């Protein structure tokens, strides 16, 4: 009894689902029948891919029109899921081929993917024909123009022809505008390039004429030293520690001698090394630093002694 009750409870739900499915199918069949004769899957496919929003007055109407065209193309009431997938793959397969093979395959109107592959293989095996291989495309998003079907519209209405003429005129105007802009920008680009070239040439010439100061200082040869001339005793001005009138005192007399002041020790001055011909400048820098450090060490020792 319990099993029978469960069957009675489940039976109406299954029937309801079947009724809903039949109502949906009949709804689509009524919409398709309102359009008149069935245009065929190929024409429906072209209409679906080339549909534009301008052909509908409202967004909802455009959506309903796309649904009608898709149902006319894929026929979900008669085809299974596998057949619908086969149609979608067959529509996309020619777009990955070369342009020559793509046109030829579409002219043959294959009904399945296997038939399309067989046509391409037979075309490549023909004697005397250059082997056509699909080109490798860069990874990434496919351009929007390749997502649409390249099937040409055979029966184009006046609205489609008007849109095509408007598109062509817009493209020609855009091309003329780009040409004019390029012609106007060419003289200014040439003038700027010549100005940059002139500035760079003048700067290079100045750099070639005037050598650097560092290079001149390093390659300069030292001037020859003059020999020291010693003064005669008793001549010249009087200096501390020197006898006044030395050499001129009368004989038999001794000049008065003054105590000489305590000599102050002279601090050695650092002698900076001068560059010689063929000597590296960094060696001169190192030697100069050594002498400066030596003088600083002597000064520090004297201050500690004091």
UniProtKB/Swiss-Prot annotation:
It is found in: Nucleus. It holds the Pfam family SCAN. Transmembrane segments: none annotated. Residues 123-136 have a biased composition (Basic and acidic residues). Residues 45-129 form the SCAN box domain. Keywords: Nucleus. One of its GO terms (cellular component) is nucleus. Its main location: nucleus. GO terms for biological process: regulation of transcription by RNA polymerase II. Residues 264-274 have a biased composition (Basic residues). Residues 188-222, 234-257 have a biased composition (Low complexity). One of its GO terms (molecular function) is DNA-binding transcription factor activity. Residues 123-171, 188-276 are annotated as: Disordered. This is Putative SCAN domain-containing protein SCAND2P. It comes from Homo sapiens.
